[in-house]
C-alpha cells in the first residue's frame, strides 16, 4: 500500500469509504460522532481542493482516506485534564476512515505522517473505542480532552 493525494476524480470513492466508516461507527456504539451525515460532502471537496486529503491505496483499490492539517488546530487551544507533550509545531490527522477491506491501513497512514513530522496530534470521539485502540497501539499517548 502507498499514500497519494486525493483528486476530484476520487470524490465518489472517498464518500463511499466514509459511508462504510459511518456504519461501522454506528454499529460499534459510536452513533453520534459522524452519524450518517459527516464528514459533509462540502468538507470533503474542500479537503481535496486544499490538497490536504490523502488516500491509502494500491494500484487497484483505495482502502482508506485521511486529512493532514499543518499548523495550529483551533480545537487544541484548550485542553482539559492534561497537557500536550510539547508546544512545538505539529501536524494533525483528521477524518480517518477505512473500508475495512485490508489490514494495515492505519499503520500505513501513521508511517506516512511520521515521515512528514515527528510531532503528530490526533484526536477522536470519546465513544470511538476502535480508533482509541488503534491510536494507543501505534504509540500515541492520551494528553487530555479537547472540544
Q: Residue ranges of each PLM-predicted region?
A:
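Conserved GNAT-fold acetyl-CoA-binding loop/helix
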Residues: 22-43
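Conserved catalytic-core motifs of GNAT/GCN5-like acyltransferases
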Residues: 123, 141-147
